[in-house]
Amino acid sequence: MSGLASKAKSRVKSSKGKNSTNIHADELNEDVGVVVRVMTAVVDVKFASGKIPKILNALESKEIYNGKKLVLEVSQHISDSIVRCIALDGTDGLSRNDKFIDTGAPISVPVGRGTLGRVFDVLGNTIDECGPLEESSYFIKQIYSEIPKLTDQKIATEILVTGIKVIDLLAPYLKGGKVGLFGGAGVGKTVLIMELIHNIAKAHKGVSVFAGVGERTREGNDLYHEMIESGVINLENKDQSQAVLVYGQMNEPPGARLRVALSALTMAEYFRDAENQDVLFFVDNIFRFTQSGSEISALLGRIPSAVGYQPTLAAEMGAMQERITSTNSGSITSVQAIYVPADDLTDPAPATSFAHLDSTTVLSRQISELGIYPAVDPLDSTSQALSADVVGKEHYDVAKEVQRILQTYKSLQDIIAILGMDELSEEDKLIVARARKIQRFLSQPFHVAEVFTGAPGKFVSLEDTVLSFKGLVEGKYDHLPEAAFYMVGSIDDVIKKAELLQKEGKV
């Protein structure tokens, strides 16, 4: 339960001794307003003159709509008596003169140990049909909070091992850092984020919080069951669960999709600040957060900015992203899937996210068309952690040599397409052969895709990854066929696959 109802009731009871249930549209008091205009997801509410609610306050309906009370969030003051609000649920059935109560505070959600193993909506209501939360197991906290002071923040220098070769080698993640998974439609963002949840959250000793922002309901359901199967959520004993899920899916109004990331982040901040934990914060998808803000902005009457986005895009993104940080109390490591419209990384939505991230993992349609998954572009993906001071000299040197070989291969592709391989020098032929093996070795079978591929998932340690690629760039495996490097884990798997291919006479 969100706690909005109880706050509203207590305020209404204490307001000048009046019984607010008998108030008509022309007898407004400071707590009760009436609807004067409805524009789908935006609603205008009139209060007594000079007694309007503060910006960001939550208003709760007195009537029931679609089986529950409707909550609005104050966004603008239109006059000294009218506020323009964002609806956080569907407005079907809402009409003029319907009454709303000012709760006197912003949206609040439950935080604490009692939230573990549960699924919530944007308002903090449980939606997993496992009953209400135990009263003693949670606290209520507003979804808006101050950004931690610079003196309280901590710099991340420790590598977070994901078990995914291409990420650990070329764009490593920092523990306590922010990571963006960029990609167009259908290149594997959600599968990659689910594999990261499987690999990291399962081995992670702290708490994981997942925010489903405007994505498919089916994927949210799949993730919930995946977490149950992997033991991250324990239905029998919720206290042993390690994850909280907060969903505002595609079918929900833009107001819910705009605020659900903040609701989830509030829960993550509690575990960081009050319980001194290292928290994993997954968001799928940040673009939907931006998109919902654009929908709301148009309805609020703001003049659109570049490519039709809201003029407040940078401010909204910054207000959320700057709260995702590590402090002296604990850390929040954030992994965010970011949809790239029309595969254009210069689009304002993904471009605004870049400035806030420590690591960027770019998924490429060209690589996915080659059948290489995860379709991570090893040349476009970046990480602040890829320096000799953080990852060590050996790792850094191997990663840079891998990138050099791949870059050389990329520059030779036009010549190969026009003149063929025979026109290349012997040195270039060797580079091309190694690059093709590296390209295939960067593929990897995922645990979460086992049901589709039939191939068991592989987790590769950082040490194995560095040693395997070191041998590859030094030419130790030049004698092995290309096919042996495709969809395997460590170099030992490559050698076994090469022997198997030889026995079957396929090489």
From Swiss-Prot:
Stored InterPro entries: AAA+_ATPase, ATP-synt_VA_C, ATP_synth_F1_bsu, ATPase_a/bsu_AS, ATPase_alpha/beta_chains, ATPase_F1/V1/A1_a/bsu_N, ATPase_F1/V1/A1_a/bsu_N_sf, ATPase_F1/V1/A1_a/bsu_nucl-bd
Keyword check for Ion transport: yes
Swiss-Prot/TrEMBL catalytic activity: ATP + H2O + 4 H(+)(in) = ADP + phosphate + 5 H(+)(out)
Record: residues binding ATP: G183, G184, A185, G186, V187, G188, K189, T190
Signal peptide start-end: none
Region named Disordered: 1-22
Keywords, sorted A to Z: ATP synthesis, ATP-binding, Cell inner membrane, Cell membrane, CF(1), Hydrogen ion transport, Ion transport, Membrane, Nucleotide-binding, Translocase, Transport
Subunit structure of this chain's protein: F-type ATPases have 2 components, CF(1) - the catalytic core - and CF(0) - the membrane proton channel. CF(1) has five subunits: alpha(3), beta(3), gamma(1), delta(1), epsilon(1). CF(0) has three main subunits: a(1), b(2) and c(9-12). The alpha and beta chains form an alternating ring which encloses part of the gamma chain. CF(1) is attached to CF(0) by a central stalk formed by the gamma and epsilon chains, while a peripheral stalk is formed by the delta and b chains.
Entries under NCBIfam families matching the protein: atpD (TIGR01039)
Name of the featured protein: ATP synthase subunit beta
Gene designation per UniProt: atpD
